[in-house]
Amino acid sequence: MQTKATAQEFSVITSRLSFALVSFGILLAAQLGAHAADPVAELASFSVFNNVDLAQLANADVKPMRGPAMNNARFQSVQTCWVSPGAPAQVASALRSFNPARHSELKVLLHTNGSNFSQLGSLPNNGPVEWLQNATAQKSNELQLSKEEAAKTAPFAQFWSGVLTARASAGVFGQPPYSNSSNSIRPGDEINSLLSEQPRIKKQFGGIIGSKGEQYWELLDVDNKGVLTLGSSFNKGMQIADVLYYASGGYYAAVTLYQLWPVDVGGKASTLVWRGDLLSSGELADLHGVERLGAESALIKDVAKSVRAFRSDSGSR
């Protein structure tokens, strides 16, 4: 059933989106004194959380909420917040060191910082990789490539190394369109549209996303299909943006935003964390009624699962 496949795709995407953070932390110290005196009020000013209780958040399981409705049928959003022990710099350090590939349930088969794609020649021998190899050899229309990329012929590792190298060099907003879509989807346009659909969030995080940031690439298991992705992480004060700007399948683009505030809970230095997930997927556009609701519920559950994995690893829960 289509909803099941879509839910599994979202599970991998949100797991990765949670914590692809590379350089954040030192800048926090300079921002603490100047930041808003009332984190709860600031949180309410741009999010779906109108009045949170910090003590309850510190002791409760994470409970993501559906974000405001968006006009584009391809788009979906989820927000969540929680309290972690320690100052923002400590929480940021834990985010940087979190490795989703260590959690088999998150289905991140490979994560590599930077833009060296030599590991494409020694990928694991499993079902998702075999699917990707066959799809590449057969020029499957399930692969999201430009017309120029699709026309190239080369061995698997060489082919994908060329595609990923060129796209990584182009940066977030320089991506060529996916030719397997009748709408000629450009990932950079999707990212801008996702943010424009959430004006309060766009205002809160204005200027944080640049061209390249701290780059990484991954191999994901999406419904037993291998998917190669490119992403970049950006930071600005106590804000983080993690942008997935290329995927060989499964979704068009995705953005995860984080805001961190220093708070005191029970006399202990803590950090209030807000996270917002914005996702564009062709699968979503085809879902209606019960199937659409099922996909939304699946995304909420998967965001919760990925946050729980981080909190468990970092000792936050």
Regions found by a protein language model. Give the residues of each.
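Sec/Tat signal peptide C-region and signal peptidase I cleavage site
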Residues: 32-36
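Bacterial N-terminal signal peptides that target proteins for export
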Residues: 3-21
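Eukaryotic helix-grip
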Residues: 37-317
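Bacterial N-terminal signal peptides
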Residues: 18-31
